[in-house]
A protein has these predicted regions:
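Hydrophobic residues in well-ordered beta-strands that form the structural core
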Residues: 38, 99, 120-121, 127
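Expand to "…catalyze enediolate/carbanion chemistry for C-C bond making/breaking, isomerization
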Residues: 20, 24, 34, 104, ...
Length: 141
């Protein structure tokens, strides 16, 4: 963690599924002076964050299975965003909701409508005829 901080990192993201002691890792990151995000894979329930949600700055919901670009958006992610937004509201957490995978203009609009704050749009941008225009259109969601 120290080495990452020393590189100038402002936020460190850890996968829920990769941490045996998530709370300890979150606290170590915060103690190092960085913000912290926790990532959930598509099959991991939002409920797994109940005990940690007040301690994190952002939650990244994967809307495809990690590994390679160009996958189709997993539709039940919309329900997960709604559930996470409710958890954040009910606990007084200030965490942002980020979604990565299969994000384009259509899915991006749906995600923003159900409560997403941050969108990661790889192929929608890099395969667009005009990347600048696509970025502008995504930002306007």
């Amino acid at each position: 963690i120290k080495e990452v901080k020393d590189l100038g990192t402002m936020m460190m993201n850890v996968h829920y599924e990769a941490c045996v002691h998530l709370h300890r890792v979150v606290q170590q990151i915060k103690d190092a002076g960085m913000k912290v995000a926790v990532t959930l894979n598509p099959s991991t329930p939002v409920a797994m964050l109940v005990d940690i949600i007040r301690d994190v700055d952002m939650v990244l919901l994967m809307s495809v299975n990690p590994g390679f670009g160009g996958q189709k958006f997993i539709v039940h992610t919309l329900d997960k965003v709604r559930e996470l937004r409710e958890l954040i509201t009910n606990t007084g957490s200030q965490a942002l909701i980020e979604v990565d995978g299969g994000v384009n203009l259509e899915t991006g609009r749906q995600l923003v409508e159900v409560g997403a704050d941050v969108l990661v749009a790889g192929n929608a941008v890099f395969k667009a005829p005009d990347m600048s225009d696509m970025i502008h259109r995504l930002k306007s969601l």
